[in-house]
Amino acid sequence: MTDVIYSVENYAKTARKAVAEGIVLMKNDGEVLPLKAGAKIALFGRSQFCYYKSGTGSGGMVNTAYVNGIREALEGDDRFVLNRTLSDTYEEWLKDHPFDQGAGWAQEPWFQEEMPISRELVEETRKESDIAVIIIGRTAGEDKDNAAEEGSYLLTAAEKEMLQNVCSVYERTIVLLNVGNIIDMKWVDKYDPSAVLYVWQGGQEGGSGVLDVLSGDECPSGRLSDTIAYDIKDYPSTAYYGDTLENKYAEDIYVGYRYFSTFAPEKVQYPFGFGLSYTQFEVNGEVKAASLTAGGKVTVEISVKNIGRVAGKNAVQVYCQAPQGELGKPARVLIAYGKTEVLMPGETQVLQLEAPVSAFASFDDTGRTGQKSCFVLEAGEYRFYAGENVRDAGLIGSTSIDTLAVTEQLSEAIAPVKAFRRMKPACADEKGVYSVDWEDVPLRTIDPMEKRASNLPKEVPYTGDQGYKLSFVEEGRVTMEQFLAQLSDEELCCMIRGEGMCSPKVTAGTAGAFGGVTERLQYFGIPAGCCADGPSGIRMDCGTIAFAMPNGTCLACSFNDALIGELYEYEGLELRKNKVDTLLGPGINLHRNPLNGRNFEYFSEDPLLTGRMAAAQLLSMQKYDVTGTIKHFACNSQEHSRNFANAVVSQRALRELYLKGFEIAVREGQARSIMSSYGPINGIWTAGNYDLLTTVLRNEWGYAGIVMTDWWAKANDEGQPASFQNTAAMVRAQNDLYMVTGDSLSNSNEDNSMEKLADGSVFRSEYVRSAANICRFLLQSPAYLRMVGKETDLDRELQRLAEQEMSVTGNMFKLEIFEEADVDETWIDKAKGKSTTLEVTAKERGLFRMEFECRAAADAAPLAQINLSVFQDKQLAETVTLAGSDKEWTKKVVHFPDPLFSYTFFVKLFFGMSGMELRNIKIYMTKSMEEETRLKMKIHREETPE
């Protein structure tokens, strides 16, 4: 444990700082920023009234106590004066143009309709204000990609008109982009605002962080974690993006700056790592040592001097240019980065940075170097560059090797089976820019099932109950195999089924329970572990308050591992407070293309930055015995058809890019939990992909944690259709947990676990192996500590804090009941995040229940997660969960757990997501306990001394 004490105030301060350090200043002509005290501001853009704290879907569904948006932050600072007349005009317009939150899961619009801004209106505001701030907002998320169209990646006509009129009237204009990931930026050159900032989606303290940068309380130090090209078509992945059945990774390892620095530097509007400051820095570097051998590293020394007039931080990056050799290489690869402390004008800091050779070694999937399936350093000169972005980084040194060096010997894995061609460099011009050539991608030569057959775990025969508990394993009294030998085949099959969503066996409103999900498994001392959606905070669909974090892109743009680690110590404490063992995050897929809807959750186009951000979060959360589940393993590069679109990708691209961030999180971040993705890679769905989950993850990386599926994911036997019932394929691959089923014991999902065990398609030892992975995870969890009575003073203090916190409230209506009462359906606000409270007055005291019929809305996406939590007073009675495919009316009965000993009680209905339809809502008295209650109260009065 560390000395960090859970405090919402300190949590908020740290998040606020992370927001500020993640903001990227793109333009600042005439030093319009920072704002001077007394500035009179005209605030344009309807997004000022609907700040996007995060993207949509499971990654953003956090119930917050508050959200401090940009307008609220500016209004609360007496250094600045907002144009009240303009604000009133917006508020009047908004009465007829309310916020459109969509019809439910994945149906939220990308943007909100913009109020028309005429030149006359702008000129009127100019009479009162001397500076204009324009806010443009965007969102996207799970099951909903961005699109290369107006209102998403491109500006709308109304937004362009607003920019045109405001920028032509005001001499000083500032544009704030409240977005989850990068958007088209051609408009900057056209309308020429004075300043532009990516302020991202900053969670509940987002507006506060923006205020700090605008005011100059924080000097901007964020750097782009992605390359911004002039046009969406300039990204080579765009040509293959968005197909329903297949996503061909023809650009191979040339993603983001790796592509542009090699083939098309002229197409870059803003380079990777770009970001301005209110001050200036002088950066000098030197390569101090370089060992280009297996296990070797490069050490560089970077001197950063503040040569400006303002105190500030600087983020510096180190890149490698490897020789083209036989394989072909990107012109630049990020190998290290660091961030200074706050430097006063004239102050210098020297950063010592190290890069292992694994950061720039190349994987040979062709055998062209004579070392097939190896990471190698080819002979030639290795040049190293340092600076503030990939384009401007200057040469700081070089070293050469005369012969090829093998840095890691591996084996063929996850190879494609479908022939395709990939990009490679051909000839370079006088400026070092290469033309594009194409080559055939090597195809698979080894069947993964042959590897499985030669790598089966030793059989563990069933012994029956020997009296061993899981605690005996911790104490060293028995081995894990001896303990698990007690479990029958049926019990092992129960073990690999997680339950949810909103299982009553764990914290209310969370994503799922796993491990000890049956009475029999709990008899053996196996606790039920709890997982909750992230990564933007803890999602609890019962309405419990949690802290909403800045989005992943914002955090990555800070280039500050230490600060992100500090922030996630608070996340770790909050997880432990809420009895959640693992947060379902961070998301660490790469920003292969700007249109991926979940880019807001993910960090960057670069695997090193991605992996180190993930490692910082994991190490900090794990100080409190909780962790994060890194996801989505792997290649979740688009949301459209994410269950079906086959990622056709080379081994080299997987090894150097798409798996690299996960590898860093495993090796450096000590990851203990991983979520596989929905779709297939090279024809095999990831949830049952043996090469991915066993050959690479466990055998090569040494991973010993759990792997869980995404919710209701599918798996397949190669060449066969995928099914969410094929848990046998999952266990065979070491995907330990199928998430989720309604009831593990009854096999409510009707999976094939027992069937395939009986016919020999999968062996008992493979189920034991997954059960062992699950148990090892649980032995390190707070759930286990609670089960064995080892709660700490920290747990007791966190529990005290939890009891003080309040949940979301909403509209309240009164209802009287004798034997039954109808609930007016118009009372119920079924919108996302809304609750309705019924104050129920009964004629008699007793036990009560609620009955209703429900279904998913007709336009709900099939994988939508639609939840309704029903409370009696402050206690959760039940969470009703529908999938978007549940389109038929279903009767639900919710029994209130506590007998009523007063004549009034409260029923709260909280909707974690919109998209559920209700009808025939009634509350019934299940049993009258009036006479019994009166008798008990009479006895109590008689026994109570006066």
Tell me the role of every PLM-derived stretch.
Residues 1-392, 408-853, 867-946:
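Glycoside hydrolase catalytic-domain context in secreted enzymes
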Residues 393-409:
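C-terminal tail/sorting-segment detector
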Residues 856:
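Family-specific functional microsites
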Residues 863-865:
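Acidic, Ser/Thr/Pro-rich low-complexity intrinsically disordered segments
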